[in-house]
């Protein structure tokens, strides 16, 4: 029954946006503002996805973002799989991104620590979670699209880069985590 309520509410929002033309207008505005820059389009859609995903459950976030934002990414030339994974990923990142950070606040409550500090710590430790969607949007071989050699090369180099970046951000080699 919970899923029916979520899907019904998302359907009402999406239906309203489609009837008023705002869904199509958002796609056009995103493409117009970004111009020919895929990176600017990805940054704008990431911010919008995090904002729209705050406080919403997974299914509702995906339905909303797949209707509003994914068409702009597909129109810009990003593969449909990468576009939908990008919006889904950033919609879910709203759960650990302050100020809402529902998952971080729940973990802080269990651990008995300050929710705000837990949210910022989750953002700092999980920095690579904000980078990975850009990687697979720009290089779909991370989503197993393409030849086996390109997939292996991309996964290997991305893994090494994320490991090195995480060690640098967290400071694991110089201090204990």
Task: Tell where the protein language model's regions lie, with residue ranges.
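Transmembrane helix-loop boundary segments of multi-pass membrane transporters
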Residues: 86-89, 115-129, 136-160
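Hydrophobic residues within the alpha-helical transmembrane core of Major Facilitator Superfamily
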Residues: 13, 47, 93, 131-134, ...
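Core transmembrane alpha-helical segments of multi-pass membrane transporters/permeases
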Residues: 1-22, 38, 42-51, 55, ...
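Hydrophobic transmembrane alpha-helical segments of multi-pass transport and channel proteins
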Residues: 51, 55-56, 72-75, 92-99, ...
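Hydrophobic transmembrane alpha-helices that form the pore/transport pathway of multi-pass ion
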Residues: 58-93, 100-117
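C-terminal accessory/binding modules appended to enzymatic or scaffolding proteins
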Residues: 161-177
């Amino acid at each position: 029954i919970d899923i029916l309520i979520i899907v019904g509410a998302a359907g009402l929002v999406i239906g309203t946006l489609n009837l008023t033309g705002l869904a199509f207008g958002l796609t056009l505005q995103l493409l117009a503002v970004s111009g020919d820059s895929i990176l600017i389009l990805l940054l704008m859609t990431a911010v919008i996805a995090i904002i729209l995903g705050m406080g919403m459950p997974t299914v509702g976030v995906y339905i909303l973002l797949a209707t509003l934002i994914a068409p702009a990414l597909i129109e810009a030339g990003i593969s449909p799989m990468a576009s939908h994974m990008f919006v889904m990923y950033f919609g879910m990142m709203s759960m650990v991104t302050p100020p809402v950070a529902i998952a971080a606040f729940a973990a802080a409550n269990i651990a008995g620590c300050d929710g705000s500090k837990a949210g910022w710590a989750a953002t700092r430790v999980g920095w690579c979670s904000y980078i990975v969607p850009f990687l697979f949007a720009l290089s779909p071989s991370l989503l197993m699209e393409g030849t086996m050699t390109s997939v292996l090369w991309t996964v290997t180099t991305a893994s090494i880069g994320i490991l090195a970046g995480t060690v640098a951000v967290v400071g694991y080699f110089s201090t204990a985590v």
